[in-house]
Amino acid sequence: MASPGQESVHDLIVVGGGPAGVMAGLLFARAGCDVLVLEKHADFFRDFRGDTVHPSTMEILDQLGMLGRFLERPHNRLYEARGTISGKDYVLGDLRHLRTPAPFIAMMPQWDFLDFMRDEAEIYPGFALAMDSPVASFLEEKERVAGVRLKDGRELRARLTIAADGRSSLARTLLPVENLGAPMDVFWFRVP
């Protein structure tokens, strides 16, 4: 990555080092691209973001040849969803019948999952992850996004910029893009 005052050019910049951003970086680096993933936080260990890796995600990891290494990491397995209704316990869902390489939910904190994804992505020479690199704005040229400007003033250019910056997306705030919504939402809360 360039120093302040220097320009950096990449095939691809991904804004956001969460699961979607790191996975995008991994896939493009695997395809031979020069990829820079930018994460605003100094590390992945931050506020609660989730702790489940679902069978469909593990199926993708299997297709990429990564599932075995993923399952070597510490995790717990949830095969059933159970609930208590009017004092009686019920099995609400049983994943064991799924025709997938991992018919369970892997319970793993998101920061551990992101460490795994980063480790896998760093196998590819074109992958770089820059922590503590908050984006201030997007560089626009000829009606296209040409890169980003970091809060420290550095300008990083790319042939393609992907916004994977999550719920509080800077991209949706700064760029003239329409928010199409989502078919579902999740309500997160803390129990004291």
Predicted regions located by residue number:
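Core beta-strand elements of the Rossmann-like FAD/NAD(P) dinucleotide-binding domain
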Residues: S8-H10, K151-L160
